[in-house]
Amino acid sequence: MASSSGSNHICSRVIDHSHVPEFEVATWIKITLILVYLIIFVVGILGNSVTIRVTQVLQKKGYLQKEVTDHMVSLACSDILVFLIGMPMEFYSIIWNPLTTPSYALSCKLHTFLFETCSYATLLHVLTLSFERYIAICHPFKYKAVSGPRQVKLLIGFVWVTSALVALPLLFAMGIEYPLVNVPTHKGLNCNLSRTRHHDEPGNSNMSICTNLSNRWEVFQSSIFGAFAVYLVVLASVAFMCWNMMKVLMKSKQGTLAGTGPQLQLRKSESEESRTARRQTIIFLRLIVVTLAVCWMPNQIRRIMAAAKPKHDWTRTYFRAYMILLPFSDTFFYLSSVVNPLLYNVSSQQFRKVFWQVLCCRLTLQHANQEKRQRARFISTKDSTSSARSPLIFLASRRSNSSSRRTNKVFLSTFQTEAKPGEAKPQPLSPESPQTGSETKPAGSTTENSLQEQEV
């Protein structure tokens, strides 16, 4: 008897047909979201489009490897698709006018599938880009094995194929349906709520929404929980890699002399510039993890709430918590696709400089070889002027210091093959990479040969 009384008490709080119109948010929320979504849309499209152009310029000018460029361009494309596919359709069908008729079932399925694919492509691109940087910093001798053009294409292909597989179940589980249709296979509350024509004839209901179909409940649940597991694995993996990269970057590199013969490697005391670059990189790595956690978690919680139990078992408190969370989770989710260009600008002075040049249509960046030659000529002229009145030991010291100053101001150096003799080859650099404050220099190298030094 007590069990029956408790069940009746819970059933008195379960939503019914009178609550269905509340799936449409209040007008003031709609207007606020219009303004917020418009700002996010413009900033996101512009920022990611400029990012694509900047990475192409940096690669062409010799500052960025093609493999890193491919990763960043693919990530920016997935972010742009998230905005183009997700934001207009989601705002209209979920926020502005959620109640519709079943005639829009195909558009609901396609939108959900494509949006899920692009969303998880963005997530997995963060994973692969972090993995590429992790190998370069923590396991540099293994870097070439995973950084070739073929390996990068395989990684990018893996990202898009895996994202499509994660989203594929939603193509069958989603559709247009009256939200309170009973799920036949679900053993939930037996409340015997009053039925309406929308229950009996869901195919003719004008109060349907784009939601999970009642006869595909298990498919929907497995899809949402599986996607959540993928998110947790990616978050944990990126956090692990960023933590290990930060440990490597925080190690002291003072006073180490290694090597034999003509090749000597001198690890110098860090300059203020190197310390600043390292601090910015550590901040950048932390921001990657924070962005994945803060921007993605609210949306994942909302999805788990939708998959935890069918809507006909939702209490009024549960339903209102879901509707309050909806606009916040969507906003934070779209912000995750806006912050990537911002992180690049924070992490690299070179990227930030070219970003604003592209934005202002005033590109003045010189090729890396040309810039190094100009610096070499300036140093040669300066050294020849002062050599008559300076001991050779001080002259050699100044040349060593000038070589240190020629290090490009970017963060995680990308290892390249050494230039051939007599050929100046630039050191392409990743815009999210810190300099390590060490150099490899042949004994007795001339100023011209300094263009071929390999800076690690």
UniProtKB/Swiss-Prot annotation:
Region (Disordered) location: 415-456
Residues that carry a glycan: 192, 206
Tissue: Expression is detected in septumamygdala, parietal cells, enterocytes, neurons and pancreas, in peripheral organs such as the duodenum and kidney but not in the pituitary and hypothalamus.
Modified residues (Phosphoserine): 397
GO molecular function: G protein-coupled receptor activity; metal ion binding
Segments in the Cytoplasmic topological domain: 56-69, 132-151, 243-283, 345-456
Record-linked Pfam families: 7tm_1 (PF00001)
Database matches in SUPFAM superfamilies: Family A G protein-coupled receptor-like (SSF81321)
Disulfide feature: 11-191, 108-210
Miscellaneous comment: Was originally reported to be the receptor of obestatin. However, numerous reports concluded that GPR39 was not the receptor for obestatin.
Principal subcellular localization: membrane
Protein's membrane topology: Multi-pass membrane protein
Biased composition (Polar residues): 430-456
Phenotype of gene-disrupted mutants: GPR39-deletion mice show a significant increase in body weight when fed with a high-fat diet, with about 2-fold increase in fat mass compared with control mice. In addition, GPR39 knockout impairs declarative memory and spares procedural memory.
Protein name: G-protein coupled receptor 39
PANTHER family, alphabetized: G-PROTEIN COUPLED RECEPTOR 39
